[in-house]
Amino acid sequence: DSGATSTAPGTIATITQTAAKPVISASVSGTSYKVKITSKTSGAVIYYTTDGSEPNAAYSKGTRYTGAFTVSPGKTVKAVAVCNKYADSSVSSKKLAKLTTYKITFKSNGGKGSMSKQSMAKGVSTAISKNKFSRKYYTFTGWNTKANGKGKSYKNKAKIKLTKNITLYAQWK
């Protein structure tokens, strides 16, 4: 937005206020980041980029912000706020750190079917994937870090924080 306002012919409007610089916040969601952007300027429209480039004056390089979005680790989010009767804000920037990820390997432990490995960011509470194994004449009772059930037990879809790669074995009764 150029900030131009309608004035009487022959007069020049002076812009005295600048839109508030956007605030970029990010939280880890799975193995990515969930990004939210806000501006304290009422009615401001926010444009952003995720490749580190500047959301330029014509906004041809920016995407209009309409709500939270997901971004891969290692990216840089930049944003600018624009509003009628205001000068454009300065550009905000947030570098999203690379995440250490760990994997859960699922073993059927006598059951049938398959499950893909599940990736989780280090130290982030994430639900274990829902069991997809089956075993004729048996009921799935949860997961365990040992095939014999004498390790650490987890309920189906329980939230856990990983600090290393683990293998979970389906438990049956």
For the regions a language model picked out, list residue spans one by one.
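Surface-exposed interfaces of beta-sheet-rich extracellular modules
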Residues: 1-3, 43-46, 84-90, 124-158
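Flexible, glycine-rich phosphate/dinucleotide-binding loops
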Residues: 55, 113, 149-152
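Short, compositionally stereotyped local motifs that mark structural "simplifiers"
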Residues: 1-104, 110-111, 160
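Extracellular modular ligand-binding repeats in secreted and cell-surface proteins
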Residues: 29, 35, 69-73, 109-141, ...
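Residue-level detector of conserved, well-ordered beta-strand and adjacent loop positions
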Residues: 38, 49-51, 56, 107, ...
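Short acidic, glycine/proline-rich loop/turn micro-motifs
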Residues: 58-63, 116-117, 154
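Conserved "repeat-terminator" motif of extracellular CCP/Sushi domains
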Residues: 14-15, 97-107, 133, 152-173
